[in-house]
Amino acid sequence: MTEKGADGADGLTKAKSNAVSEDYETVNHVTGLKLAVIVTGLCLSVLLVALDNTIIATAIPKITDQFHALEDIGWYGSSYLLTICAFQLIFGKIYTFFPVKWVFLIAITIFEIGSAICGAAPNSTALIIGRAVAGIGSAGIFSGALIIIAYSIPLEKRPAYTGAIGGMYGIASVAGPLMGGAFTDHISWRWCFYINLPIGAVTILSILIFLKHPKQKLDNNQTWKARLLKLDPIGTAFFMPSIICLLLALQWGGTKYPWNNGRIIALFVVFAVLISGFIYFQIRGGDSATVPPRILKKRSIASGAFFLFTIGSAFFIMVYYLPIWFQAIKGASATSSGIMNIPMVLSLVVLSIASGITVTAIGYYAPLYYVSTVLTSIGAGLLTTFTTETSKGKWIGYQIIFGAGVGTGLQLSIIAAQAVLPLEDVAVGTVIMMFCQTLGGALFVSVGQNVFTNLLVKGVVNAAPGLDPQVVLRVGATQLKNMIPPQFLDGVQVAYNDALTKTWYVATALAALSVIGSVGMEWKSVKGKKIEPAAA
């Protein structure tokens, strides 16, 4: 390249850099009491979303007793996840072309309507519909909270607040089963959903009163029809049913239907066809696509999304299956197993906040990716060593290591997206990250369920030959000691332990794979500087 050409390229780069800087200078900087109220409201909104992921788990037995709908158990969780995954990416476009404040408030309102339907549900079908409606609102809440942070706080101060929101997500994800058990045992399972109404009302009021409209680059001269056409309706028409087909195949495969069943094969085939169509229209659509290729081609975005997919998946496997170990092996109740998860919660929250503060202080987030990968992998690996005799010190210590790893990395990809993208692209970048985390959790909780169920059945056959494995599956973890004949109990507990620890191998492998995202992450600073790692 000629010197002139090089200067021209440098000038273009500087122009883009300056454009990004100018974008961030237009942020409505909020301070003092107003900022505290807004951040509190945003944290409460994230609490709602994360609680609803897991709070229903311990309430399901009472719900099925009341509605006599044992066959609907899978739908209580999957209907919520299906609509979250189906609508999450489209919210990225909605936040780009419509006012952030009003989109966020509408998302919370939809979530509240869904929660009210669930709480008042007269039958199982109404509960499933309510969960699906709540999932639509939930799809726009977490990403919306992070987008509001982006529009309200300077980039260099943002990681600390992002860390606080990430910590709230971790608390609620793990505390959900504990709260669900407490409500179900002492009040009513309906309060697992009614509790969302006052919390959501506080969030709505705090945002409505204290948040000014962010300075978005909106074309107010466009008609609503023109804006709606920018939401990539063709891509959305391919994407939503493709994700639903994939999740249904994983939800039903190996449990309700064998993997070679025609329904499961058909779902995978339809998924492959539809997702291929979605990818084609994304490439063809350019900036009008739901996932603009120029954003996904950025190294930090692709690496951060992969990292969050793997770490998030590992985290959700442990969130769902670690309490089962406490119930089946240690004889804990549903509520007690939630309390025994506190070491992981505390370390996750402390490290999430500390990670955000560290990035704010030093500017660079890339080194913390490696810390997260190492700690999460070691912690997950240590958890796979559990036996029926594992001591209290070990199960506390191993949880702390795992939680510290997840907490360190959970919010880093959001920070990376906000550091490398201009402000008008932050909404889409944030939603891409959140979608990968949600999809990873949805996919691998289903994978974990299949691994666990199949290994438990085989283990019971080997360890307790005279016992029907289906009896063990129906009894559930909390009732093992009460319902399984004493002569079979030791063998069943060994089978449970082996099935669970091998399920955690999946989490360990995912944590180790996150190193790909760590290595791929660019070394950029939230303070506006870029450094390169030292050459080997």
From Swiss-Prot:
Query: Which keywords label this protein?
Result: Cell membrane, Glycoprotein, Membrane, Transmembrane, Transmembrane helix, Transport
Positions annotated as glycosylated: N123, N221
Q: What SUPFAM superfamilies does UniProt report for this protein, alphabetically? A: MFS general substrate transporter (SSF103473)
PANTHER family the record matches: MAJOR FACILITATOR SUPERFAMILY, MFS EFFLUX TRANSPORTER INPD-RELATED
Gene3D superfamilies linked to this entry: MFS general substrate transporter like domains, Multidrug resistance protein D
The record gives the membrane topology as:
Multi-pass membrane protein
Name assigned to this protein = MFS-type efflux pump MFS1
Where are the membrane-spanning stretches? Answer: 30-50, 80-100, 102-122, 133-153, 163-183, 191-211, 234-254, 264-284, 306-326, 342-362, 366-386, 400-420, 426-446, 503-523
GO terms of molecular function: transmembrane transporter activity
Q: Relate the protein's function as given in its record.
A: MFS-type efflux pump involved in the modulation susceptibility to azoles, including fluconazole, itraconazole, ketoconazole, miconazole and voriconazole. Confers also increased resistance chloramphenicol and thiamphenicol, suggesting that it acts as a pleiotropic drug transporter with a broad substrate spectrum. Finally, increases the tolerance to cycloheximide when expressed in S.cerevisiae, but not in dermatophyte species.
UniProt superkingdom:
Eukaryota
Naturally occurring in which organism (per UniProt): Trichophyton rubrum (strain ATCC MYA-4607 / CBS 118892)
Q: What is its main location?
A: membrane
Question: What family is reported?
Answer: Belongs to the major facilitator superfamily. TCR/Tet family.
**Cellular location(s):** Cell membrane
Any keyword Cell membrane?
Answer: yes
For this record, the Gene Ontology CC terms, alphabetical, are: plasma membrane
InterPro entries noted in UniProt = MFS (IPR011701), MFS_dom (IPR020846), MFS_trans_sf (IPR036259)
Q: Describe how expression is induced or repressed.
A: Is slightly over-expressed in strain TIMM20092, an azole-resistant strain isolated in Switzerland.
